[in-house]
C-alpha cells in the first residue's frame, strides 16, 4: 500500500471516530443534582433531626427528618393528616395509613377521605328527637348525636335514611379491622355548624387531601345531620359557605363522613 493510500485511510478512520463520539455526546444525560435527589437542607437546618444523610455530590447538602416527621405529632392541627395510629403530620408519612384530615382542632374532628351522593331520607317524616331548626348554627349542632338520633328512629320505624346510614357504615378503604376507633360505627354525618367549620378550613383541608391522593371537597351542596322540618334538612354549599334547606329525598347532594378523635 502506498503512502497516499495509508494517509487517506487514516483520515477516514479519524473522521469516523469523531463522528461516533459527536453522536454519543448529543445523547448525554445531565447528571442529577443534590436538590433533585432530595438533599435540600443544610447542617444548621437539620439541627433537630434524628436521621440525616449527606449528599454524595456535595457534603454540605443534607436530607434529614425530625422525630415528629418520622412518628407523627400527637396533637392534630387544622389541615393535618390523621393516621390510623391516631398521630398527625403536615406532610405525608408514607409508612403510615392516612384515614382523614383535621378540620376542627378545638373539637377534635377530622373529615373522611371519601364522599358520595345520597338522599337524606327515603320519605318525608319528622324525627321527634331532632329539633326543627330555623338556625342551623345554634340548633342541633352535635353531628354525632344527630346521626345517632336519625339511625335509632329509622330502625325503630323501619325508615331509610341513606346519608346517615352511609356515614355510620363508613370505614376507610385501607382499614381491615372491625373493632377500631376509626372503623364502621365511629363516623357520623356532620351538623350544619360542623360543615360551616369545614368550609372555613376548606383550603387547608383540600391541600392535605391532595397530599394523600384523596377526593377533595368540591363546590357542591353537602348534607348535614341538622333537620329543618319534616320535609327539609339543612345543607351547606361548599363553594361559598351558603347554608340552606332542601327536600330530604333529594339524592344529588354530597355526603362526607366525619370522625371524632
Give names to the regions the model predicted:
Residues 1-11:
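Bacterial N-terminal signal peptides that target proteins for export
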Residues 17, 112, 224-226:
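Short linear Ser/Thr-Pro motifs
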Residues 57, 192-261:
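C-terminal, surface-exposed recognition/capping segments
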Residues 111, 189-190:
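Short hydrophobic beta-strand that contains or immediately precedes a catalytic carboxylate
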Amino acid at each position: 500500500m502506498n503512502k497516499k493510500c495509508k494517509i487517506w485511510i487514516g483520515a477516514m478512520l479519524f473522521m469516523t471516530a469523531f463522528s461516533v463520539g459527536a453522536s454519543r455526546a448529543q445523547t448525554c444525560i445531565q447528571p442529577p443534582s443534590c436538590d433533585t435527589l432530595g438533599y435540600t437542607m443544610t447542617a444548621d437546618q437539620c439541627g433537630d433531626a434524628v436521621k440525616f444523610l449527606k449528599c454524595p455530590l456535595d457534603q454540605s447538602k443534607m436530607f434529614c427528618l425530625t422525630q415528629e416527621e418520622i412518628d407523627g405529632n400527637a396533637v392534630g392541627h387544622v389541615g393535618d393528616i390523621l393516621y390510623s395510629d391516631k398521630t398527625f403530620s403536615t406532610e405525608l408519612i408514607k409508612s403510615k395509613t392516612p384515614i382523614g384530615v383535621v378540620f376542627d382542632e378545638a373539637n377534635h374532628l377530622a373529615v373522611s377521605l371519601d364522599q358520595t351522593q345520597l338522599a337524606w331520607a327515603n320519605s318525608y317524616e319528622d324525627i321527634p328527637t331532632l329539633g326543627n331548626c330555623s338556625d342551623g348554627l345554634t340548633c342541633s349542632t352535635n353531628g354525632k348525636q344527630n346521626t345517632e338520633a336519625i339511625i335509632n328512629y329509622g330502625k325503630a320505624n323501619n325508615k331509610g335514611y341513606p346519608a346517615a346510614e352511609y356515614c355510620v357504615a363508613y370505614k376507610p378503604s385501607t382499614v381491615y379491622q372491625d373493632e377500631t376507633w376509626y372503623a364502621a360505627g365511629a363516623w357520623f354525618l356532620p351538623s350544619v355548624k360542623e360543615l360551616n367549620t369545614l368550609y372555613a378550613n376548606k383550603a387547608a383541608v383540600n391541600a392535605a387531601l391532595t397530599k394523600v391522593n384523596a377526593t377533595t371537597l368540591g363546590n357542591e351542596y353537602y348534607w348535614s345531620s341538622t333537620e329543618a322540618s319534616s320535609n327539609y334538612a339543612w345543607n351547606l354549599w361548599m363553594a361559598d359557605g351558603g347554608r340552606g334547606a332542601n327536600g330530604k329525598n333529594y339524592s344529588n347532594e354530597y355526603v362526607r363522613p366525619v370522625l371524632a378523635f
